[in-house]
Amino acid sequence: GSVRRGIGSAVVRQLLAWPLPAARTELMPTHAQLRAIIAADPLRMRCLAHVRALALPDCWVAAGFVRSAVWDHLHRRGRSALPADIDVIWFDRARCDAAVDAEIEARLRRADASLEWSVKNQARMHLHNGDRPYRTAADAMCHWPETATAIGVRLSEEGEIEVAAPLGLDDLFALIVRPTAAFRGRKRQVYLDRLAAKRWSETWPDLRIVQG
């Protein structure tokens, strides 16, 4: 399946600390590498704990939260700053009103006002994106622009880091920016405009950009 569990994050934190030397992870399977990178970052672990406390269904912290951590690690950076917005996704067809997302964002700000939170119930986002209704949060991620963006993590009740990677982790760890299927076709220009706006290569020069 697309959800993988790792060893307990408390154990990982005893073994690893940020910055995490790439040589210590390069022989691990990619799911284990990702869990180790996230577990070694105290700020990201704090974010995951805040989100777990909400007890939302099918809920993940995704996109740049994961992507930039891995890219920074592979660029041998000493630390990985959080993205401007921390993308929290969840899936519940019974609570599709945008006001519910706004209230969840307010709860997260009360928990940690130093962070910028963005909460989106993926059960309604197909309307915004012009797609068929999504079935799960992972299904929604398959309709995001890049394969390396379509990845989420969360903390289980047991403190394990779980990974949702419906399109796999290969591109993320190969430093490849590649459009997903929809963004190779009718949404290709959206992908190209996003590349121009993000200017990722300026921050991560080892990236290989696929133009679509």
Predicted regions located by residue number:
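Extreme N-terminal basic, low-complexity initiation segments
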Residues: 2-11
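Catalytic cores of the polymerase beta-like nucleotidyltransferase superfamily
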Residues: 15-212
